[in-house]
């Protein structure tokens, strides 16, 4: 695998920002899957490659990894600050095409993240479903309005969202409503959360909402907390599921059993 760490100038952010990219050193890069990996609130773009098997998995699946940096922005166009959502969902693919020749064909493009990054990944997929074949969220901040006071210790939520109120375009439960009439494509989802994670109940509620809409999704849960041990395991499962098995089924997994529902 080739590994690149670069700083690019972003018009959306009004500043230079870091991006990590890994690319297979064999095979046809034009046909390689592209996986965006989004970091969590207390981490940065290095976490995925420092603490998980991400690069090994990318090699196994012949995939390109793109890992951006977003600070503590919740992947949002901030009320008082940079436009991080515009950067991730619109500008970053253009920058990767310009500098690396990466062509993110929707049928082979995936976005995944943990915690805050899981929220960001799903927000991207729900907002622009035509851009992604699949999406994965691990221990995601599913109910962002309820979690903000606990997560934002310096009250940065006031800078991200006006008056600390999450608007519909930034709320996952509001975003999925547009899919109810069946006219929007539903990217395949892989959702995972540890049973001891404080975000587990909210992830169950999101899972139930999506299942009621017959969303093509995989749900994985196992004993585990909000940590890299669980996310490393979940990443391997998600990449195998999404990159190898793009079927027409909704699959529900537990640590011990799996059932497949047409």
Region annotations inferred by a language model:
Residues 1-262:
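Non-catalytic cap/lid and distal C-terminal segments of serine-dependent acyl enzymes
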